A protein has these predicted regions:
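Structural detector of well-ordered beta-strand residues that form the stable sheet scaffold
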Residues: 322, 406-408, 448
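Catalytic-core region of carbohydrate-active enzymes that cleave or remodel glycosidic bonds
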Residues: 423-505
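Short, glycine/acidic-rich beta->alpha junctions
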Residues: 80, 184, 249-250, 302-303, ...
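Aromatic-lined carbohydrate-binding surfaces of glycoside hydrolases
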Residues: 148-149, 157, 178, 188-196, ...
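Aromatic- and acid-rich polysaccharide-binding/catalytic face
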Residues: 408-431
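Bacterial Sec-dependent N-terminal signal peptides
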Residues: 1-19
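Mature N-terminal, pre-catalytic/accessory segment of carbohydrate-active enzymes
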Residues: 14-276, 376, 572-589
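Catalytic domains of carbohydrate-active enzymes that cleave complex glycans
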Residues: 332-335, 343, 347-413, 481, ...
Length: 589
């Protein structure tokens, strides 16, 4: 407790990097300097203000007249318990004062989906950049932003309810309906309305056909979702002391967004800078280590326990505690040395005696603590993208400390160690051999796929096509993986609401949830894909049990397109079209 008490007593003064209060409410976007439609284009509008249904597949440009055609009623299909999205587009010649959105309840005879199940958002614009110049992906230094083609793109789903809309601009509106699990099947009709102080209210009708199928609660989905959390970014952005009540209050709604989409793993850091401070807000150790005068070690788990208890009991993410890492990028390990009364570092590589002593002593005590808390079976010692020989040496130390410890790796496949890995996530474009995957499944091991800055496609950069988020997780099912891992969901850059660019990777690589919390087009499309993955799981089991081989073959054939080789066979069909076709097939079965 001494470690935490000292930290909290220090308060905001401990956080010298916190020099600016960043916006949580309304804010001013950066200026878009790209060429855009001028007065001569905007003057051709048939009415000074227009409001029409668009598509969730497009990021509409703020300063261009959108390519949208007037339609009647928007029609969507949904399972009970499913979330469905739509995007409307408001564009105007004149400034709109006090624009706000309203939505009615949805009615199907005497049955109602309440307005409380419907969320609406103004879509906001954030600065983005581009792929590497050779189109190969988004990895590599980007310190000089002037070297990269930057522009403003639609992505943020804002929580501000009333907005001023500038003249000659486009303002998208996002609609999200979470159909109640007990909704009666049928067609529900509702209305989306935009109104303001200086323009007439405009209405768009929509209809959701609820089919007689039910999605389970997200935590019961078969898909293993692992999006890494960064509590340190929240403390910096919200200007609150680490691990204070205010910090947990700020994190709660952010982390609940993850629980509500089936997140399985808690990201815990068990050493100082496990990734060498690669993010704007580096991870620190949640476990305090002290070497006493007599050379023995003591460990304080106060912060680790608070974080895990919060995530399990208040947020509802309970399946796995991923503890990073024993093999950091910089092989330097911190501890407080009582003899010198200061923090010291041990430099040691896997295979060296100093490494084995530092980690072996800790892991034995950590095992004891986890067993006392009842968390041992849920906890894994986790590594990512580390060389095989280093992994082998680390595994030896782990097994010597407690042979029952679970071990995870996100990195290249190595046959020599895969059997030791309870959870192995391999890069996009790599596959598990069929017999290896079957054996891992038999042993209760988890086998997933991950993407990062490497992939030009599919990805969830802020300039990526929105449908790529759904495509990515559908690929996980198509490739026979158990789920999907991405290394960051809220490792925010300095000013994430206005500028998604980062010094090391393509814009948006480090996050898909914004402060507020605010969702994003990317995150909502990811949810769409996750729901389709669960539908596929349900339908495959059902069709196999019924012996409906024709329908099963049709489903698997469509799903096979969501692999690198399958996509090529489609002549690289647009991800938007592929996801739409898959969604339609799942809803008709």
């Amino acid at each position: 407790m001494l470690f935490l008490s000292a930290l909290l007593a220090c308060g905001p003064a401990c956080f010298s990097q916190q020099v600016e209060k960043f916006p949580l409410g309304d804010y001013v976007e950066l200026t878009d300097t790209k060429p855009h439609d001028g007065e001569e284009v905007w003057s051709k509008m048939t009415a000074p203000v227009r409001f029409c249904w668009g598509t969730t597949d497009v990021r509409y440009k703020k300063l261009n007249v959108p390519d949208v055609k007037a339609t009647g009623t928007l029609r969507l299909k949904a399972w009970k318990g499913e979330r469905v999205n739509a995007q409307a587009v408001l564009w105007t010649q004149k400034e709109l004062e006090g624009a706000e959105i309203a939505v009615s309840e949805l009615k199907n005879g005497s049955s109602v989906i309440p307005a409380s199940a419907v969320n609406t958002y103004f879509v906001r614009y954030v600065m983005t950049d581009e792929l590497n110049k050779d189109g190969s992906g988004g990895c590599g230094p980007r310190e000089n932003k002037a070297e990269w083609d930057s522009s403003m793109v639609a992505d943020v789903l804002d929580i501000v309810r009333v907005r001023e809309v500038q003249a000659r601009s486009t303002q998208p509106v996002w609609l999200n309906v979470w159909v109640p699990a007990d909704a009666r099947p049928g067609k529900y009709k509702g209305t989306l309305t935009v109104s303001g102080k200086n323009f007439e209210a405009m209405k768009l009708p929509f209809e959701i056909e609820v089919v007689n199928r039910t999605l389970p609660e997200p935590q019961k989905w078969a898909f293993h979702l692992d999006l890494w959390q960064n509590p340190y970014a929240v403390a910096r952005y919200y200007q609150v002391p680490l691990w204070s009540k205010e910090h947990f209050d700020a994190m709660r709604p952010i982390m609940k967004m993850l629980a509500n989409v089936g997140q399985r793993a808690i990201t815990a850091s068990i050493m100082h800078k496990p990734w060498a401070g690669q993010t704007e807000d580096h991870y620190d150790s949640m476990i305090f280590r002290m070497k006493k005068l007599d050379g023995t070690w003591v460990y304080d788990y106060t912060v680790f326990d608070k974080w895990v208890e919060f995530m399990m009991n208040e947020v509802g993410i309970k399946d796995l505690i991923s503890c990073y890492t024993m093999i950091p990028w910089a092989l330097s390990f911190d501890y407080f040395d009582q003899a010198t009364n200061r923090v010291q570092f041990i430099k040691a590589a896997p295979g060296e005696e100093a490494y084995a002593e530092y980690w072996g002593t800790f892991l034995k005590d950590f095992s004891r603590h986890l067993r006392e808390k009842g968390w041992f079976e849920k906890t894994a010692i986790s590594m990512d993208e580390r060389p095989m020989e280093a992994m082998r040496e680390a595994i030896k130390v782990i097994k010597a400390a407690d042979p029952e410890f679970k071990i995870t790796l996100a990195g290249n496949y190595h046959e020599e160690i895969q059997g030791d890995l309870y959870y192995l996530s391999i890069p996009y474009g790599n596959q598990f051999l069929e017999e290896v995957k079957a054996e891992r499944e038999r042993k209760g091991q988890i086998s997933t796929v991950y993407t990062c800055c490497t992939e030009a496609f599919p990805n969830t950069f802020t300039f990526s096509e929105p449908a790529e988020a759904a495509w990515t997780v559908l690929h996980a099912v198509a490739g026979g993986y158990d789920g999907y891992l991405r290394w960051a969901v809220n490792s925010w850059p300095m000013d994430p609401l206005r500028d998604s660019r980062f010094r090391t990777w393509a814009a948006g690589d480090t996050y898909s949830i914004y402060p507020g919390p605010r969702s994003s087009i990317r995150f909502e499309r990811l949810v769409e894909g996750l729901q389709d993955c669960e539908k596929i799981h349900i339908l495959r089991e059902e069709l196999a049990a019924k012996g409906a081989n024709g329908k099963l073959k049709k489903l698997n054939a469509k799903l096979s397109e969501f692999t690198p080789e399958g996509w090529i066979k489609t002549n690289k069909k647009s991800p938007a079209k592929m996801v739409s076709e898959m969604n339609a097939l799942l809803n008709e079965m």
